[in-house]
Amino acid sequence: GIKTLDGFDWSWPKKINRALLQQVFRLDFLPQHGNVILLGGVGVGKTHLAIALAHTACLQGKTTLFTSAVDNVNALAAAQATGGIKREMARLLKPSLLVVDELGYLPIDKFGADVLFQGISQRYERGSTVITTNRAFKHWPEIFHNDSTLTSALLDRLLHHAESIVIEGPCYRMRDQSDA
């Protein structure tokens, strides 16, 4: 089924700022081109909430694009190889809301770090971005090819108008596993 905020199991996360999350779902950040970072371990509901945010934006008539960080980088790499990088970058810049899922789950090479930086930089104050990640900000240089200068610049733009929501708890998908 469609992921919604109503379908989110609030009893599962050990820690989540429910009031802030509900405020974010009013989408007041979209007209201001703000961003949302959903930060937490594996299986705590980040992707569910990101999909639900995108769905809510669609219901309000906003253009939305959902992609994983790796798919995003791969699409840009393929576009670079065929001379279509400007067109692919434009596709990422066009929607009111861009959701980048799973940033930090897999390492990104220098090209990937550079193009992700370009995309987020170009969206700065022009469009909203939601990012799900399992990495604390202090570990983001590891995502971006250990380029601390690029990472600092990226975080500066991303966090300037952003709400960061930390979700803590065990993996929801493992809730039915016994301790046998």
For the regions a protein language model found, what residue spans apply to each?
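Conserved P-loop
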Residues: 16-94, 143
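Flexible glycine-/small-residue-rich
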Residues: 12, 40, 169
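Walker B motif beta-strand of ABC-family P-loop ATPases
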Residues: 97
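A generic structural signal for short, non-catalytic loop/turn and secondary-structure boundary residues
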Residues: 1-3, 31, 160
